[in-house]
């Protein structure tokens, strides 16, 4: 913060207005040579620190953790990498793979994965929107539909979007770009692509240009435009491409580049935590049932009779019932049976997760592990329901949570069972003649549609 202003030879006022520096960053090898020296000078001359925030960058190593060098032949040419994968995918990989202050084990296959799974998903989502928006001539010229009048799915994705804005803004503000990138990546792949767009496809396929279709376009446009702004500090090129393409058609923003716009601001009024929780439960049940289908080799087009879900609270029952139709449609099952007592049906097993217990309880971990494995069905049920459980041992109390244990259950005849946190799902895997015929009919229709 001294030489950059040619201080003390000139710019005294400029220097004083910018001292101490807000932020500096250098490699970890500069701890003594730079970080310490700046503070030492500031302490001697100004009785002050030299900077308010510092990040000590880690080193870029090869994928095996060795320092890159010409002698070892393990160096990666950055220009070849950028030419092959592009600067955005390279930047996104390097920032989201490890924290800036940690060493980065650079693996070229990781960039390829980012390009396919994140960049590809984001651009495919935009391409889906652009395809149907161009067909229908959507330019956002209609009056914007109030959020409270939109479908539950639209309100949910907008709620998640503003929750994301808040979290990303906090992460960047706390100098945690890795956390920000990972949050955005999860939102795009899991919330936007795998859930919102997939469940909304039929709304875009409709022939008529209805109010519901306009709502779908306006919602997806808003999400894509906001995402382009959120990713712009890390992925400057694809963000600008999406932003400019959107605004070329709508002219809603006069900025010529996403980098000349304001960063998104969270609207707390659009955040509905109850709705977010409800949809998260639906996503979790959907994932669990599809996993059970895969485990038992039952394709999704094969209808099944029933899902059985133990519910031990009115709140959980209310949340699942509110999205029951959506769940049944997604997993292709006829009905959900809710049970309030699973003791005669499911026998749970519990075992400790040492990776979680070790840092918390140290030398007591082994004794505590034995107590956990000795828990009865009522204790396991309490832990699943409340999310925590207290074990008393040697006149001491030890609090454990669902993150400290793994709860499993054996499959029961005719059923396949999965547990994830507080949710247990049992899938009826019996395929009757009637269900089999319905599955064949669905398969027949699918084959014909593919041929068309």
Show where each model-derived region lies.
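Feature 926 captures the class I aminoacyl-tRNA synthetase adenylation module centered on the KMSKS loop
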Residues: 1-3, 7, 45-83, 87, ...
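Short, solvent-exposed helix-loop connector elements
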Residues: 102-111
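Conserved catalytic-core segments centered on acid/base and nucleophilic motifs
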Residues: 26, 34, 230-233
């Amino acid at each position: 913060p001294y030489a950059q202003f040619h201080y003390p030879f000139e710019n005294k006022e400029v220097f004083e207005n910018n001292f101490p520096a807000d932020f500096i960053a250098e490699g970890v090898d500069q701890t003594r040579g730079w970080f310490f020296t700046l503070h030492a000078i500031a302490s001697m001359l100004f009785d002050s620190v030299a900077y308010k925030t510092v990040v000590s960058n880690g080193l870029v190593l090869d994928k095996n953790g060795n320092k890159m060098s010409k002698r070892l032949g393990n160096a990666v040419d950055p220009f070849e990498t950028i030419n092959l994968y592009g600067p955005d995918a390279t930047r996104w990989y390097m920032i989201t793979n490890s924290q800036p202050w940690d060493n980065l084990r650079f693996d070229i296959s990781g960039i390829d994965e980012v390009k396919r799974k994140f960049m590809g998903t984001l651009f495919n989502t935009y391409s889906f929107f652009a395809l149907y928006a161009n067909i229908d001539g959507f330019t956002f010229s209609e009056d914007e539909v109030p959020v409270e009048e939109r479908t539950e799915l639209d309100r949910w994705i907008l709620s998640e979007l503003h929750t994301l804005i808040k979290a990303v803004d906090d992460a960047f503000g706390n100098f945690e770009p890795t956390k920000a990138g990972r949050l955005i990546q999860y939102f795009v792949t899991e919330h936007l692509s795998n859930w919102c767009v997939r469940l909304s496809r039929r709304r875009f396929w409709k022939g008529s240009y209805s109010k519901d279709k306009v709502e779908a376009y306006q919602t997806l446009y808003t999400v894509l435009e906001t995402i382009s702004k959120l990713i712009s500090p890390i992925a400057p090129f694809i963000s600008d491409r999406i932003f400019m393409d959107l605004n070329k058609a709508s002219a809603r923003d006069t900025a010529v580049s996403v980098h000349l716009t304001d960063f998104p601001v969270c609207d707390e009024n659009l955040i509905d935590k109850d709705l977010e929780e409800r949809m998260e439960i639906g996503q979790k049940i959907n994932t669990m049932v599809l996993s059970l289908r895969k485990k038992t080799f039952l394709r999704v087009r094969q209808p099944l009779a029933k899902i059985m879900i133990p519910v031990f609270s009115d709140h959980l029952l209310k949340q699942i019932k509110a999205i029951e139709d959506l769940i049944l449609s997604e997993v292709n099952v006829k009905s959900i049976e809710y049970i309030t007592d699973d003791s005669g049906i499911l026998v749970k097993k519990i075992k400790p997760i040492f990776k979680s217990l070790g840092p918390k309880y140290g030398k007591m971990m082994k004794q505590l592990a034995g107590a956990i494995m000795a828990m009865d069905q009522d204790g396991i049920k309490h832990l699943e329901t409340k999310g925590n459980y207290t074990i008393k041992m040697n006149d001491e109390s030890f609090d454990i949570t669902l993150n400290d244990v793994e709860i499993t259950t054996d499959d029961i005849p005719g059923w396949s069972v999965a547990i994830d946190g507080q949710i247990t799902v049992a899938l009826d895997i019996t395929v009757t003649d009637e269900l089999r015929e319905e599955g064949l009919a669905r398969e027949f229709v699918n084959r014909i549609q593919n041929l068309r």
